[in-house]
Amino acid sequence: MAFTPAQKHLFYTEIAKMVEAGFGIREAGRAMLDTRLPARQADLLRAMDAGLEAGKSITEAFGADDRSITELERRIIGAGERGGRLAPAFQHLADYFGMLATARRDALQSMAYPMLLLHLGLFVGVLVPGLMGQSDFIDIAKNFV
């Protein structure tokens, strides 16, 4: 299971804060591993640390897991690495995933009331008249369909 946008928002926010504070990417990853991260994030940081230990670039080390890191993320991290501005790159990713999580949450919240009305309409329009007429369930279901 891949990260949710909300999880990625928090993940990249923490990395951005640590890199901005002067931590190296390895130290930031190790410090984050000392906290209670979801297993998938911890695995990603361990793989990143192993990749960096093997001499890979930050982008290559992060991008090794195609299921967790998208092409967009790889490219933004790569641009930040090449430009020497990793903290802003991670913050851009955090902002992007924060906006995505907010948009998804707002869309789901916006659908709650119409779904309630739909179910209430089905109940009032089909089930109540059937039950009031003392019909059995088969007749009610036939009227519904």
Cite the ranges covered by each PLM segment.
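Catalytic metal-binding core of the metallo-beta-lactamase
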Residues: M1-L117
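Bilayer-spanning, highly hydrophobic alpha-helical transmembrane segments
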Residues: M99-V145
